[in-house]
Amino acid sequence: MLVFVTLGTWLAVIDIDLATIGFFAWIVLTYSLKFLWSPLVDNFSIPFFNKFGKRKSWIILMQILIIIFLFLISITDPSTNLSLFAKFAFFVAFFGSIQDIAIDAFRIEMSEIDEQGNLAASYQLGYRIAILLATSGALILASRTNWSFVYQLMSLFMLFGFVGLYLTPENKNASLRQLSFSDSIVAVSYTHLRAH
């Protein structure tokens, strides 16, 4: 939401034209296209982060990158450097989509099938709270402070994810099997084509 609704509001407040703001909506397409890079997340581990486990290593790296690029957004003036601002927003969305893949896989692999409903509900609750903070909370705060501060604060909120990740063990659901890289590309493509 920080690179969609909240970012669009920031741009509107500083009188960026609506066509340009509409163009920023394309940034969130990264979430729709995440099936393209999900086989990479499924089959490769992050060097230097392996000690945390495959899924956690992806989540940790993506959170670090999101924090960095949210901070870069916060120190970039979109009225004078819109193209750089857009690039930073794209990277936040792109790394966020990769983090989504890793979090979904982590959630699915950490428990047995009969516990999946509870985990999905907990995930949705956390997601909805994050949306409220990143939209309504950010807009209320921006009306009282400034956009730079809001995005810096939101990047700090990302640190809560590290706490949750640290407290959660990375278990392996024994009923799931790992697909090879080529099989996962075929499976993802087939599933995506069937759904659409």
Regions found by a protein language model. Name each.
Residues 169-187:
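Flexible cytoplasmic inter-helical loops of multi-pass small-molecule transporters
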Residues 133-146:
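Transmembrane alpha-helix termini and helix-breaking/packing motifs in multi-pass membrane transporters
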Residues 191-196:
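Conserved small/polar residues in nucleotide/adenosyl-binding loops
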Residues 1-28:
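Helix-loop boundary and gating motifs at the non-cytosolic
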Residues 60-78:
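C-terminal ends and interior cores of transmembrane alpha-helices
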Residues 121-135:
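Glycine-rich segments within core transmembrane alpha-helices of 12-TM secondary carriers
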